[in-house]
């Protein structure tokens, strides 16, 4: 008879190796920075296992493996999770958000497609969207920018006009009350003034970025990771790298149609309950498009997003 294998004694816990709670404040690949809930020094953490589903803003449980490192063992329940996706993969932005702030500028020419997609993402995740039009001191480009944003104002979206560099005090006065006490993600194309806005609202942002970058071992690549900054008046600002595309392949057709506020009052009036709002007879959305109540650019965005959702590899 074989002897039962001798049970190996449990390895002693690493220094401070008990499970503790914290919040993810930065992410770069599979590297995460966690701020302990007890206020101790931040840690570089890695997810347990090969697959990583951790996002900035997550409340997590971690186990310390050394003085300044740990492993994330559990993700707390999320209120929401914002991410973008193409037909093959998804990229997490952040979790547990209240608001989405998208930064545009009079120049360079901003992408209306990206603006529309960001607003749809906000609506689909029940986030309050805030649109900032920066560089209003570039007066020659201001009328065109206002004209392009007029349809969004008409839909009820909050559009703030400011000049972060030209009138920083006014910019701070407009933004601070809207951000206080809320977790807000900041999105914007390169060149829109997003970094300047972060530095205005978070005076020590550059120092914090250098510290986090060093902890992530990301060296000079300081703009390639998402990070969270606590705000003086409560709440947090989450800065995500400048982006040039915003896929929403993961949104179902049902979620998409409800993410257009101008569609919602009409959805119950289509002739067919499973109307796709593309070519169907008796479609209330298409009737509103024909008589000018819905902008052609908005319906075109809806049609494009429905097409993208049909291409996803599940």
Curated annotation (Swiss-Prot):
It is found in: Cytoplasm. Its EC number is 3.6.1.-. Disulfide bonds: none annotated. Residues 1-21 are annotated as: Disordered. GO terms for cellular component: cytoplasm. GO terms for molecular function: GTP binding; GTPase activity; metal ion binding; rRNA binding. Its cofactor is Zn(2+). Zn(2+) binds at residues 270, 275, 277, 283. The keyword rRNA-binding applies. Its main location: cytoplasm. It is an enzyme of class 3 (hydrolase). Keywords: Cytoplasm, GTP-binding, Hydrolase, Metal-binding, Nucleotide-binding, Ribosome biogenesis, RNA-binding, rRNA-binding, Zinc. GTP binds at residues 134-137, 188-196. PANTHER family: SMALL RIBOSOMAL SUBUNIT BIOGENESIS GTPASE RSGA (PTHR32120), SMALL RIBOSOMAL SUBUNIT BIOGENESIS GTPASE RSGA 1, MITOCHONDRIAL-RELATED (PTHR32120:SF11). Belongs to the TRAFAC class YlqF/YawG GTPase family. RsgA subfamily. One of several proteins that assist in the late maturation steps of the functional core of the 30S ribosomal subunit. Helps release RbfA from mature subunits. May play a role in the assembly of ribosomal proteins into the subunit. Circularly permuted GTPase that catalyzes slow GTP hydrolysis, GTPase activity is stimulated by the 30S ribosomal subunit. Monomer. Associates with 30S ribosomal subunit, binds 16S rRNA. This is Small ribosomal subunit biogenesis GTPase RsgA.
């Amino acid at each position: 008879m074989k002897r039962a294998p001798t049970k190996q004694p449990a390895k002693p816990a690493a220094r401070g190796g008990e499970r503790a709670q914290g919040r993810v404040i930065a992410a770069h690949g599979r590297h995460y920075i966690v701020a302990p809930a007890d206020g101790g020094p931040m840690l570089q953490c890695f997810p347990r296992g090969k697959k990583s589903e951790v996002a900035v803003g997550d409340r997590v449980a971690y186990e310390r493996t050394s003085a300044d490192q740990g492993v994330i063992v559990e993700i707390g329940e999320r209120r929401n999770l914002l991410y973008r996706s193409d037909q093959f993969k998804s990229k997490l932005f952040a979790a547990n958000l209240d608001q989405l702030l998208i930064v545009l500028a009079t120049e360079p020419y901003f992408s209306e497609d990206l603006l529309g997609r960001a607003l749809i993402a906000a609506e689909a995740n029940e986030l309050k969207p805030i649109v900032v039009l920066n560089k209003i001191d570039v007066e020659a480009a201001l009328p065109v920018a206002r004209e392009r944003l007029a349809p969004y104002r008409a839909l009820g979206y909050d559009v703030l006009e400011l000049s972060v560099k030209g009138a920083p005090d006014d910019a701070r006065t407009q933004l601070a009350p809207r951000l206080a006490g809320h977790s807000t993600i900041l999105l914007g194309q390169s060149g829109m003034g997003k970094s300047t806005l972060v530095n205005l609202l978070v005076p020590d942002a550059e120092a914090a970025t250098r510290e986090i970058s060093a902890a992530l071992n990301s060296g000079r690549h300081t703009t390639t990771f998402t990070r969270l900054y606590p705000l003086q008046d409560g709440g947090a600002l989450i800065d995500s790298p400048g982006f040039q595309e915003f896929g929403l392949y993961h949104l179902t057709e049902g979620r998409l149609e409800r993410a257009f506020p101008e569609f919602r009052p009409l959805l119950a009036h289509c002739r067919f309950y499973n109307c796709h709002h593309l070519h169907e007879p008796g479609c209330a959305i298409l009737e509103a498009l024909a008589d000018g109540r819905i902008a052609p650019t908005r319906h075109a965005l809806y049609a494009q997003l429905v097409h993208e959702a049909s291409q996803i590899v599940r």
